[in-house]
Amino acid sequence: MKIKGVVRDDDSIIFYKNDEVFIYMTRKTKWGGRVYGQIYNANDELLLKVKSFLWLGIKITYQNLGLPISNVSFYLYDRFALGKKDKLEILNLLIYCRLYWNNACIADVKPINLLKYNTHLEINFNTKDELKIYYSTILFCTTVLYADLY
């Protein structure tokens, strides 16, 4: 399963599944390097609100996902606890990322079409579990708050 992401001119990031909008994030920058993001599903339902100050970490300030999520963020690594038994870890290796669900690699993220004006990403999932794809895409979205902003 491939999910494609595009950073648009209005600073939003849209993720497409089968060429249809799957998840999108609007972003606002504030003075001093703060970035606020709101993540929505294809039905325009607000799923998460996040804020960050430069690369010091991401804080989830609102969630509407049906299960509690907590996170720990570092510069190259993000870890999310989903409910009581699952965890998602995102390892950022410069322009490539790898997603781990309960210590098993479920996806690689890489930039594509580097010669185009906007940044294009591709998440290559090696799982068919729709819930893992859904939650992983939403939480990966929180880690790209700064993509193409500076």
Where are these regions (language model features)?
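Intrinsically disordered, low-complexity proline/glycine-rich segments
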Residues: 1-150
